[in-house]
Curated annotation (Swiss-Prot):
Region annotation (Microtubule-binding) ranges: 98-107, 122-129
Protein name: Astrocytic phosphoprotein PEA-15
Species per Swiss-Prot/TrEMBL record: Mus musculus
Tissue expression notes: Predominantly expressed in the brain. Low levels in some peripheral organs.
UniProt modified residues of type Phosphoserine: 61, 90, 104, 116
Amino acid sequence: MAEYGTLLQDLTNNITLEDLEQLKSACKEDIPSEKSEEITTGSAWFSFLESHNKLDKDNLSYIEHIFEISRRPDLLTMVVDYRTRVLKISEEEELDTKLTRIPSAKKYKDIIRQPSEEEIIKLAPPPKKA
């Protein structure tokens, strides 16, 4: 799948050495320290994740989570765009698939919604100055 390779290349091009250290730190529980030292490029990081079943063309949830906690919305947006455009999976559908970032999210699926007009708390106007 050429789109997947393009996605990884685009992500790699947007990851600096400083970013890479932050990303490795965010997933330090999954990367042994001796391996972490060997990972010196974004592509090496992606290769490590692929070889340890944390990443593949149909499952990007791990890096979505890492980009989210690393505060990299630009990288996360690229992954979400790939997921919706290439894999044809939207945010709503994601709750019902294996791509769910947080497994416990399924039980809250029906709770996550906009409040109805009756549920919105109305605030009183501010007091008038004397």
